[in-house]
Regions:
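Short amphipathic alpha-helix that is part of the acyltransferase structural core
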Residues: 83-123, 239-240
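Conserved GNAT acetyl-CoA-binding A-motif
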Residues: 32-47, 187-201
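Active-site/acyl-donor-binding loops of N-acyltransferases
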Residues: 56-86, 192-240
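N-terminal-biased segments
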Residues: 3-17, 105, 109-116
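Conserved acetyl-CoA-binding loop-helix of GNAT-fold acetyltransferases
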Residues: 11, 17-34, 166, 172-187, ...
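A conserved beta-strand-loop-helix scaffold within acyl/acetyltransferase catalytic domains
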Residues: 1-4, 9, 117-168
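Long, mid-chain structured domain cores
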Residues: 22-25, 33-51, 55-61, 69, ...
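Structured beta->alpha junctions
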Residues: 10-13, 46, 165-168, 199
Length: 240
């Protein structure tokens, strides 16, 4: 019951163009209906294959028109170190501010996380076994936690910038950019040469920043789109 997520749909190349994928996807919908599931969603990377094959299939089966879900941004330290904003908002100018390694957060910091208003996807406690201690940082103001940037090692030579949060009253002072810059500078000084991040489509401020200040220094920019199918259960069908 509840909602479902489609994780993978694949048809061998020699067997394509025979509506096998369409029949598989339709069968998934029928099984979910029997299990009283009300909605199924899919998130996928935009490629020539998904544009030519998956999106027409979703349309044919009554899925909602795909919408942008995330922008995936890739860069290297050689490229990003050219960004002028890296030195524009140093945390050393933040009177009363204290930057610390997130891997060393105190129990009081953990308690204060719950007092801040942040979206679930920005949790600093996700994927702890891959936490990158090199440049995961916390930010306090007068001993109160006000933000964090959490990164994860996703490959030997690549760090993912997973979560960036600053309490709302400090955002007008560009403290988020300050934290991001500090983390990037730490990576630039390390042997880890690649970085990646995903920006949610509903994070308007970060999308603007990414397109204006990150995009000129990227090595790759990819889209993830999302589509949903609302499932009408038999018990909810109106009599004719």
């Amino acid at each position: 019951s509840g909602d479902a997520e489609l994780l993978s749909l694949f048809v061998l190349p020699p067997c394509r163009h025979q509506e096998i994928g369409t029949r598989l996807l339709h069968a998934v919908g029928q099984v979910l209906k029997e299990q009283q599931c009300r909605q199924v969603s899919v998130i996928y990377e935009v490629t020539p294959l998904t544009t030519a094959a998956l999106e027409p299939m979703l349309h044919k089966l009554g899925w909602q028109p795909p919408q942008l879900a995330f922008l995936l941004m890739d860069t290297t330290m050689e490229r990003i170190k050219q960004a002028p904003w890296l030195e524009k908002y140093p945390l050393s100018d933040f009177s009363g501010g204290d930057v610390f390694p997130w891997g060393d957060y105190a129990e009081t910091d953990r308690q204060q996380v719950d007092l801040l208003e942040w979206e679930p996807e920005l949790s600093p406690f996700r994927d702890p076994e891959r936490l990158e201690r090199l440049n995961s940082l916390g930010l306090r103001y007068r001993e109160q936690l006000i933000g964090w940037i959490v990164t994860h090692r996703v490959a030997l030579d690549q760090i993912r910038y997973s979560s960036l949060f600053v309490a709302e009253r400090f955002r007008t002072k560009a403290r988020g950019i300050s934290l991001l810059s500090a983390a990037i500078r730490l990576q630039i000084a390390s042997p880890v040469v690649k970085a990646t991040c995903a920006v949610a489509a509903d994070n308007a401020a970060m999308l603007r920043f990414g397109r204006r200040h990150l995009q000129p220094y990227l090595t790759g920019l990819r889209e993830l789109r999302q589509s949903r199918l609302e499932i009408v259960l038999e018990s909810e069908k109106k009599p004719i």
